[in-house]
Amino acid sequence: MEKDEKYILAYEEYKKAYFKESENFDLWKNYYFFLWYIMAEDTALKLTNFIKQNSIETLLPSIASDGIKKYKLNPEALFILGYTVSLFPYFFGEYLEWEEKGKSFLESAYNLSSSDKIYKLAYLGSIYNQENKDEYDEICLQAANEVKSRFSGNGLLNSYFSEVLYRIDRASQ
């Protein structure tokens, strides 16, 4: 449904499934990301009224909070939370507080799984500066194949991360 841009139908299916299986990590991460994505792209997707009518702006932080509680030691959850929260901290609360939380989630994901190139890429990107530029550029190159492999599946989460984390062009410039 996501692939066919049937977002309202996808929302209804996610909502029903999450009500039945709120402990399912794969369901949580896809539902959470779906909610974040439609909030981030509401104007482009022409979903502004739908988001307001269904209180997505309060549902998203609630589902995020579920994930933070249940998966606080899961590097994949921390990566997804960190990346999304860092981009739009105001979706979750006070901007500076949540911006720092986003960076902290990315750092925790990397610390829990320091050999994971994608988590390292996201973490270094969150603290990017001239001092870590070379290391960041190098991890962009090293992570490229893993990005394409890990995010090769269906759904918004996979297509989004496959596109935004494949940074080989940026690193080679």
Predicted regions: what they are:
Residues 21-46, 72-91, 115-131, 154-170:
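Amphipathic alpha-helical repeat scaffolds of TPR domains
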Residues 50, 138-173:
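Intrinsically disordered, low-complexity, charge-biased linker/tail regions
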